[in-house]
Amino acid sequence: MTFRLYDTATREVRDFVPLEEGKAGLYVCGLTVQSEPHVGHVRSGVNFDVLQRWLRHLGYDVTFIRNVTDIDDKILVKSAEQGLAWYQLAYRMKRQLDRAYDDLNVAPPTYEPAATGHVPEMIVLIQELIAKGHAYAAEDGSGDVYFDVRSWPQYGELTRQGIDDMEAAEDADPRGKRDPRDFALWKGWKKDSEPETAAWPSPWGPGRPGWHIECSAMAGKYLGPAFDIHGGGVDLRFPHHENEQAQSRAAGRPFATYWMHNAWITTAGEKMSKSLGNSLTIPAVLQKYRGIELRYYLVAAHYRSHVEFSFEALDEAATGFRRIENFLDRAADVLGGIGGGIACADFLNAMNDDLGTPAAVAAIHEVVREGNKLLAAGDSPALRGNAASVVAMLDVLGLDPADPAWSSPGGGRTAERLETVVEGLVSDLLTQREKARADRDFVSADAIRDRLHAVGVQLEDTPDGPKWSLS
């Protein structure tokens, strides 16, 4: 089955046909590093990590670019409020974002360009737009440069809007604009309110790039004038992605062939956002759940579906993933290890259908159910292929518990030290239970069993003694 994906631009599911056979170029808008990342922030990182893993599974040579916006109006405001240099705040928040991605086993992109490292490329692109009559320098002395939206008749085609139906671009003082919808390509330095370090030299005077030009320039540098897939959160469709496409194509760069957008995480029906006070940071969630459980929760939902966050739903997801882990643990004990395998047809078909992760996860659970039957029947030869298939499918989703990436404190399986502690405590309780049973004190034996069950430890009495696993 051909890999098919939903293209936001055409609003239909299309066969993926790369510009160059065997290769795939992917650009995803990364975060503006202004505050500590929360669950809503990292969903995009996880979703597009699954995309790059799937493309590689299909045999594509993937070049994956995920940028970092490290200079921005909000960064300047928040750094001033905290008494920090803007670059200090950006660096600190970038470190926290890196840790969050590590905790969720988000593989690094091929390149992760920062906006501040690519100002020359942005200036060149702005000059091209001015030369082609699609941009102009403001005449109010501000040093601003704007994209002339009315010079590009296709403006609005990504989101299917007419120019006259759009709201004004609230990214700069409108006095220097020919049309309120014109958006800033370059922002002149405001020496009375902005630090000198937040300005770069340009033909229009000191200043800094606008948000939209950053991504166009960086995508062009690392992927060329035309590339396969551009991704990001659904909230970026307008104005950010609309503006990216318009300025790139106006400069003669075809830009993206496909557009993919992941949906929000919501709480009480509203987008998770720090400004709304309804966000949850990654460290806060990882105090109760493992990184692999949070990733499973995010992966199990389709990337285009809004996720209403709740701890109850996260509890259910964690329980579901533990069932998979427990099966693999038991299978590994019987087999002495699990080798490489092949994903089942239902999983492959689901992933080829616009990254259908809900159906893909369901396929994994079905194979696990079959595997548990094989364990009960003692059919080791069939179990070997079954368990290997489960591992292969989990690996595609970044959820293989044996992946070394999950050995970190926030990661997948409990850290080695904690495993030792749990093993010792459970073994001690089992010894007490066996003594109680030998003394025919079944009330005490059952009480120990119930205590273990209450904290998620399942017992199985076998001829070789009791066996335990996490439920």
Curated annotation (Swiss-Prot):
Keywords: Aminoacyl-tRNA synthetase, ATP-binding, Cytoplasm, Ligase, Metal-binding, Nucleotide-binding, Protein biosynthesis, Zinc. Its EC number is 6.1.1.16. ATP binds at K274. It is found in: Cytoplasm. Its cofactor is Zn(2+). It is an enzyme of class 6 (ligase). Monomer. This is Cysteine--tRNA ligase. The gene is cysS.
